[in-house]
Regions:
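Accessory "access/gating" subregions that flank catalytic or transport cores
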Residues: 49, 53, 57-167
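Mobile "lid/hinge" segments at catalytic clefts and subdomain interfaces of large enzymes
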Residues: 1-53, 57
Length: 169
């Protein structure tokens, strides 16, 4: 579960909070290390923080979340009685003739879909934060489903995003 500030805690496990994942703390140092060892940033992540199947689970959940939200048309829980709009945005995108407008509508639909699933109490990936839980899933979904990027490419991109998040934190 999230304890805020980008940190998570697994019930029953000892906390690794405060433990450095990487030996370098500045992007300049990481880039120099990668250049000296002829490696990509995602390879650097693998070297110090092998994520294995975990990143696949993250990606699968992001895709499942967007797919789920695109199917729903109900009202979100709470006193505001907000109507879900992701499915409607996706339908507008499907009818759109302009490629640029279609792309914008699809990205909005996917982001709303994940955010609406979050607001509706579904399981979501809340990275980098709960408030922006629609951003990364929408991009992962779009690049995989619409642009045909491979799972490996997206997985490596998520690793690099995590590296940057770790540097910023």
């Amino acid at each position: 579960y999230s304890i805020g500030g980008g940190a998570i805690r697994v019930e029953g496990e000892t906390s690794n909070e405060g433990k450095d994942v990487y030996p370098h703390h500045f992007l300049k140092d990481i880039l120099e290390y990668c250049e000296a060892h002829a490696m990509e940033l995602w390879e650097y992540v693998n070297m110090f923080d092998p994520l294995g199947d975990y990143m696949d689970k993250i990606m699968d959940q992001m895709i499942k979340t967007v797919d789920g939200g695109l199917q729903k048309e109900d009202v979100l829980p709470g006193d505001l009685h907000l109507k879900r709009i992701a499915k409607e945005l996706k339908e507008q995108a499907d009818e759109c003739k302009s490629a640029v407008e279609k792309e914008k509508l699809l990205l909005c639909a996917y982001a709303y879909s994940a955010s609406e699933e979050n607001a509706g109490g579904s399981i979501t990936v809340t990275a980098p934060t709960l408030g922006s839980s629609g951003i990364l899933p929408s991009l992962v979904y779009y690049y995989h489903k619409n642009l045909g990027y491979s799972r490996e490419c997206i997985r490596n991109g998520l690793k690099i995003a995590g590296l940057f998040g770790n540097l910023i934190k």
